[in-house]
Amino acid sequence: MESAMDARSQRPRSRQRWWLHALLLVLTLLTTTIVGSRLDANFAANRPAFLIDDDFGFFLAIWDQPRLLIAGLPFSLTLLSILLAHELGHFWACQFHRIDASLPYFLPAPTLIGTFGAFIKIRAPIFSRRELFDVGVAGPIAGFIFLVPALGIGLANSKVLPGIAEQGDLVFGSPLLLWAATKLIFPGVAAADLYLHPIARAAWVGLLATALNLLPIGQLDGGHILYAFFGRQHRRLSQIFAIVLAAIGVIFGWLGWILWAGFFLWTGLRHPPIIDESPVGTGRMRVAAVALVILALSFTPVPVRGSVYL
């Protein structure tokens, strides 16, 4: 194994396509800023955050008055910072282990949050469970470190407006961290009466992305962590967790988890084999416990009522 790792470290690194990374980042900044501008306008006017029928008219207003985009930057910069921290966590873990990897690719999209997220491309094999664990866990932890203060700042700038959370076309669930932080900052205020500031909404999206990535399934970050601990039992355990995810969707009535579980099962749950099957060690077990806590704090059985996607 040492000779294989030496060969990997001596192989020339792939060239980064800086222009493509920069272009995708700028486009994603634009799409998320447009979304943020709408969120800010609705927040200022005490209108529900998402009114689907109002989208086209607002986009025309931005076309006529581009300065409206400035108000969307708090949302977009917060969201992109969380996503960037997550992907750089993976990237730096790869760098530490001399694994060739790309810089983050951002994905602009005409969705309710303006993006499909971001990813890095790992261009070299991962040889050991320790490496796999480090690469898998670094992203969610790095993103969570940025997410927590963003959530605090966003909640501090949120406001109480009776019944606002139940109005509009979409109703958002409360992950455990958001619920606890709300009780701390707004004691006695019902969740339905709290109007989240756009920064808090960006943190909410970060929580959902973190929860999804940490699911112990397939080749998600949580799936990498699962393989690092259980090796060749990974596929069977992934199948079990995918079925559990579908069951959560059935029990709580959210089609999204059922669709995600079906997607995971349909695309296959195999994981590339690892050469070095040595245990990850006690220290990494503690880090895995931290990742499990982050998953518990980020997950919500019904992320969005009224939609199965963002």
What are the functions of these language-model segments?
Residues M1-L310:
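Hydrophobic transmembrane alpha-helices and their immediate loop junctions
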